[in-house]
Amino acid sequence: MREYQSISSLQTFVDCPRCYWLHYIAGLDGESSPAQVLGSEVHEAIRDYHTHGTHSNELSEVGGKLYKVYVENVPQSILDEPEREFLVPLVNIVTGEKLPLPFKGIFDGISTKTGWIHEHKTASNYWKLEDINDNIQATGYAYAYFILFGKLPRGIRFNILKKNKITCKYQSLETWRTYEDLIYFFNWAKRIFEEIETSDFAPKQTRFNSHHKMCPYAGN
């Protein structure tokens, strides 16, 4: 039985219940994609930058370019808590209803002085405001911030690092969440909890064809 849920686990179930079962119940870890490997590499370097002023890990060519673009645009002192982990109860902030498992995640960075959450993303294309205004991760992390600090975050800033073989670009987008959004997040999570309880974990084709290697849809 799982001890917690996360944005990744809940979203995986929404995308493909079979992939959820394989990864989160059977414990069969899938292989990381090249994009995931690059993202982890850059996130680690950014964490070290905000903690120590420089990075300690060896970077790939593209990873080095993305890191360079980041430090040229984001001050080292802007975050006082890079990669802060959290584990919070999933509670309806109005009714007090509580879900059986807590919510776990990691803020890429927060500033306790300004109240901003920072999320770092590597991407092949520029993002649009719609991408972050409807982003369930941002809503979930705003909820976690509220539970931890007793107030809404001032905002969520996405530091987007656009990659290509020649040049890498930096894009900053900002979004906000309301108390109504926090209730929406609880209800979203509750619905998925209920669906998991009765699911037969049948496979489902995902939008971007991203599947666990043992899913019948893998490679299709």
Residues of each region from the PLM?
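Non-catalytic protein-protein interaction segments used by genome-maintenance enzymes to assemble
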Residues: 87-138, 146
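Hydrophobic/aromatic-lined pockets within catalytic cores
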Residues: 26, 47-51, 122, 146-150, ...
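Metal-dependent nuclease catalytic regions and adjoining charged, substrate-binding loops involved
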Residues: 4-5, 99, 144-220
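Metal-dependent nuclease catalytic cores that hydrolyze phosphodiester bonds in DNA/RNA
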Residues: 1-112
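Flexible loop/turn segments at secondary-structure boundaries
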Residues: 29, 126-127, 164-166
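Flexible, glycine- and charge-enriched loops at secondary-structure boundaries
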Residues: 35, 127, 131-135, 175, ...
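Residue-level recognition of conserved beta-strand positions in structured domain cores
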Residues: 24, 119-122, 160
